[in-house]
Amino acid sequence: MNLIWIFPIAFCDAAEPWQLGFQDPATPMMQGIIDLHNDIFFFLIVILIFVLWMLVRALWHFHYKRNPIPERIVHGTTIEIIWTIFPSIILMFIAIPSFALLYSMDEVVDPAITIKAIGHQWYWTYEYSDYNSSDEQSLTFDSYMIPEDDLELGQLRLLEVDNRVVVPAKTHLRMIITSADVLHSWAVPSLGVKCDAVPGRLNQTSIFIKREGVYYGQCSELCGTNHGFMPIVVEAVSLDDYVSWVSNKLD
């Protein structure tokens, strides 16, 4: 039996109260986003310290009591060159890794599984188009949020659903995302995924989950009254457990 179902709170990646940082990365893409954030944060700290130092130095050395007669400066070629070149260099160091990460998000891979997510007001429909039942119908199900009164021990309020998206870990997945009514957004922070669901349009994104677990997300596009009540739950399991789950769903 799958231990994730026995101890649902032990293996989960979900938002926590007063959380300021990122959730633990479960995909190479999310790991890249966190690494890029840390690199940019380093530059921000250096710039902040430098600006504060210049500000304090100016307030100290150029106080009106120390310089009752201010010096008139109308042009400074050297300082203009410095404050043009240095920011350009910093922006270059930030842009190179960010562009590399951006292009890697659009990298096309040969997926083992394709899943279509359709946003509705206010639930999700999932279609596993690679599998057909005996009547030639693809594996399709709706995913609704579990009301607070129906939650079991260990389940998370406003985040748990009646039907999870079950996928195999360490497998290339392709998500095709669209909407049946208004704009939605399929977002799971631990997976580094946020893809808009647009009516009449198919958006796609690739996912490679490195470890087994349960990953929680929510619709991230204002879509009406119950926008905050259409969570997303992705459960990554072993390949054997995934095959068993698909077989049970098709029976």
UniProtKB/Swiss-Prot annotation:
Binding site for Mg(2+): E221
Subcellular location: Mitochondrion inner membrane
Regions annotated as coiled coil: none
Mitochondrial intermembrane side: 1-39, 105-251
Enzyme Commission number(s): 7.1.1.9
Top enzyme class: translocase
Transmembrane segments: 40-60, 76-104
Cofactor note: Binds a dinuclear copper A center per subunit.
Sites where the protein binds Cu cation A2: C219, E221, C223, H227
Matching Pfam families: COX2, COX2_TM
GO CC term, one of those recorded: mitochondrial inner membrane
Any one biological process term the GO annotation gives: electron transport chain
KW DNA-binding (keyword) present: no
Topological domains, Mitochondrial matrix: 61-75
Cofactor: Cu cation
Catalysed reaction, written as an equation: 4 Fe(II)-[cytochrome c] + O2 + 8 H(+)(in) = 4 Fe(III)-[cytochrome c] + 2 H2O + 4 H(+)(out)
Binding site for Cu cation A1: H184, C219, C223, M230
Signal peptide (UniProt feature, chain positions): none
Keywords: Copper, Electron transport, Magnesium, Membrane, Metal-binding, Mitochondrion, Mitochondrion inner membrane, Respiratory chain, Translocase, Transmembrane, Transmembrane helix, Transport
Top-rank lineage group of the source organism: Eukaryota
GO molecular-function term, one example from the UniProt record: copper ion binding
PANTHER family in the cross-refs: CYTOCHROME C OXIDASE SUBUNIT 2, CYTOCHROME C OXIDASE, SUBUNIT II
Described purpose of this protein according to its UniProt entry: Component of the cytochrome c oxidase, the last enzyme in the mitochondrial electron transport chain which drives oxidative phosphorylation. The respiratory chain contains 3 multisubunit complexes succinate dehydrogenase (complex II, CII), ubiquinol-cytochrome c oxidoreductase (cytochrome b-c1 complex, complex III, CIII) and cytochrome c oxidase (complex IV, CIV), that cooperate to transfer electrons derived from NADH and succinate to molecular oxygen, creating an electrochemical gradient over the inner membrane that drives transmembrane transport and the ATP synthase.
Subunit structure: Component of the cytochrome c oxidase (complex IV, CIV), a multisubunit enzyme composed of a catalytic core of 3 subunits and several supernumerary subunits. The complex exists as a monomer or a dimer and forms supercomplexes (SCs) in the inner mitochondrial membrane with ubiquinol-cytochrome c oxidoreductase (cytochrome b-c1 complex, complex III, CIII).
Family, per entry: Belongs to the cytochrome c oxidase subunit 2 family.
Record protein name field: Cytochrome c oxidase subunit 2
Lineage of the organism: Eukaryota, Viridiplantae, Streptophyta, Embryophyta, Marchantiophyta
